[in-house]
Amino acid sequence: MIPLRDENPTHITPVVTWALVAANVVVFVLQLLGSNGQNLGLMAYAMVPFEITRGLQVRPFPPVEPAWITVFTSMFMHGGLMHIGFNMLYLLVFGNNIEDRLGHGRFLLFYLGCGVAASLAQVASAPASVVPMLGASGAVAGVLGAYLVLYPRASVICLLTLGFFWTTTAVPAVLVLGFWIVGQLFSASLGSGGQVGGGIAYWAHIGGFFCGLVLMVMLGGLQSSPRRRAPGRW
């Protein structure tokens, strides 16, 4: 089930959402153009949990200093075309409505805050991991958590596949996002979320999702009639 768009109009131009997508794409292109391909960016700017918790360098390529900066830089990097493609698709589908609700400036802070929370959740789940962590998935997951609070009944047009048969259909956001987070929790429960030996950082996704959900509840997201911000307001 792949979300393509939602039927949830906005009142502002989502310039921050677009800027975040552009920034991620630019960084990904720079990774590809690096002298060592993606490895150059991966080694320098990805986050390694062991280096955060122990303060010791474990990768052969010197990381940026100080090491905690990689908590931010890693969320603008990706490991491949599908990685960035799906992250940016989810951000485009769901991010504009959260930006519409919060305003441009607060949305940017919200996005970055969820990304940091996601990184810390991954560090907490596997503090001794020496596997580099990268990707916007945790920050985007925070957007999904916020969307679930605000618009659970919104219709999301999804691409569905049944064997060789493909179709699109409208699915309530609560089912789309509920299916997504249950999948993350199930995968993490299998023990693969720590990323000790590589793979997907499921606990980062989970941490980002619940950070976004809780923050939106604290910001009044459960009110029955959320107020819209004035167009262009920061």
Report each predicted region and the residues it spans.
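A detector for small-residue-rich transmembrane helices and their helix-helix packing motifs
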Residues: 1-234
